[in-house]
């Protein structure tokens, strides 16, 4: 039998395909594949998975779904039950299970950002912001629109490469630019004003580095503000799988005094959280 878990976001669908079998009266669950596609069409995506993995509908135990797009789905497809998991629960479960922490602030940077306090028993959204990967890609493309032809859109990976080759200090004003000393408890490395260094020379790469910093620093500061008990912060989402992004988040954490951690499969953490919830909670009562 198979279980398919999907995180249906506003721009992408991510899926996990798991096989289940009973051996010596014990169930063995194995991850056999991960799939990601830029689409919001669940039905076509589901049939593509069936075809690619050679799975018959009769052999699928359940389809576990979460994410903003899950609310648009019916309760079944091809007579297969669709089990819906609240997105905040999936975020909490994914972050806690993968980090192996007992309690943490799970920060999901997707198109926007959601902040969830979780200890598995509690999965509560405590904050969020419209800033996220969508902001980085969208605003960067707006800034670069004069160089783009035929309505081309630069991808996240292309823009990250530009940011790596840029220097945000050529477009941003830091506390250290306007004060000899730190101000209060604010480090000299904290941005005083995004894109305010208009008297400096800068490149397009500097501009994109500035956009990435604006997004990441403000997300980090919002997380710090809502993290009242100074719990560890687990970052999840596709954006935080990039080394450049992780390094910048680490730098910001140093001057905010935050404890942060990164996990493997951070880009699939919400889908993982959904099927973990299904296996650990739902199956206990059926």
Residues of each region from the PLM?
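Active-site rim beta-loop-alpha module in soluble metabolic enzymes
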Residues: 141-224
């Amino acid at each position: 039998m198979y279980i398919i878990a999907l995180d249906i976001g506003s721009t992408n669908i991510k899926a996990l395909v798991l096989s289940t079998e009973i051996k010596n009266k014990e169930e063995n669950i194995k991850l056999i594949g991960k799939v990601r596609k830029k689409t919001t069409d669940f039905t076509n995506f589901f049939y593509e998975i069936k075809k690619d993995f050679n799975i018959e509908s009769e052999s699928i135990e359940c389809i576990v779904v979460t994410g903003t797009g899950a609310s648009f789905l019916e309760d079944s497809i091809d007579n297969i039950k669709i089990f819906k998991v609240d997105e905040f629960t999936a975020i909490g479960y994914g972050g806690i299970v993968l980090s192996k922490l007992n309690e943490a602030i799970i920060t999901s940077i997707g198109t926007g950002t959601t902040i969830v306090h979780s200890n598995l028993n509690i999965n509560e959204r405590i904050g969020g912001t419209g800033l996220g990967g969508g902001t980085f890609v969208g605003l960067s493309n707006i800034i670069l629109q004069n160089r783009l032809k035929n309505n081309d859109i630069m991808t996240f990976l292309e823009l990250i490469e530009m940011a790596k080759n840029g220097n945000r200090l050529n477009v941003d004003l830091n506390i250290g630019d306007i004060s000899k000393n730190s101000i209060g408890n604010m480090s000299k490395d904290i941005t005083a004003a995004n894109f305010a260094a208009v008297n400096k020379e800068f490149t397009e790469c500097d501009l994109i580095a500035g956009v990435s910093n604006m997004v990441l620093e403000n997300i980090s500061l919002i997380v710090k503000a809502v993290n009242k008990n100074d719990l560890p912060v687990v970052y999840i989402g596709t954006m935080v799988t990039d080394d450049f992004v992780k390094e910048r988040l680490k730098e910001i954490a140093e001057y905010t005094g935050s404890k942060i951690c990164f996990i493997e499969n951070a880009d699939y953490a919400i889908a993982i959280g959904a099927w973990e919830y299904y296996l650990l909670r739902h199956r206990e009562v059926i």
